[in-house]
């Protein structure tokens, strides 16, 4: 789980812990491989995956981040994609341009 501003990024498969949102005003962004997750992955192989943002969200600077897909690369396929999905989501919320992920290897 990662908290970015008032956004709480959680694993779709985990129980959401509202203690991290004391005022109850968090926007919950789910990450996982379920079809109803806010963020999911497709085309997973030994080199990377396609990051899929399935609904619009707001960045910390209040810019709209539209639904989109882009490739994320890694040097070794992880056993669990949630950490990568959550870090990439956090970076988007901090206004990192998705084009940056063309040159980053996790």
State what each model feature region is.
Residues 1-30:
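Flexible active-site lid/hinge loop adjacent to a nucleotide/diphosphate
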Residues 29-106:
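Adenine nucleotide phosphate-binding catalytic loops in nucleotide-utilizing enzymes
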């Amino acid at each position: 789980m990662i908290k970015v501003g008032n956004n709480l990024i959680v694993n779709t498969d985990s129980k959401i812990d509202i203690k991290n949102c004391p005022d109850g005003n968090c926007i919950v962004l789910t990450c996982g491989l379920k079809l109803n997750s806010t963020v999911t992955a497709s085309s997973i192989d030994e080199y990377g995956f396609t990051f899929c943002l399935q609904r619009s969200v707001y960045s910390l600077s209040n810019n709209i981040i539209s639904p989109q897909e882009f490739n994320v690369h890694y040097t070794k396929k992880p056993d669990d994609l949630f950490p990568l999905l959550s870090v990439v989501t956090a970076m988007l919320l901090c206004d990192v341009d998705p084009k940056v992920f063309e040159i980053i290897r996790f």
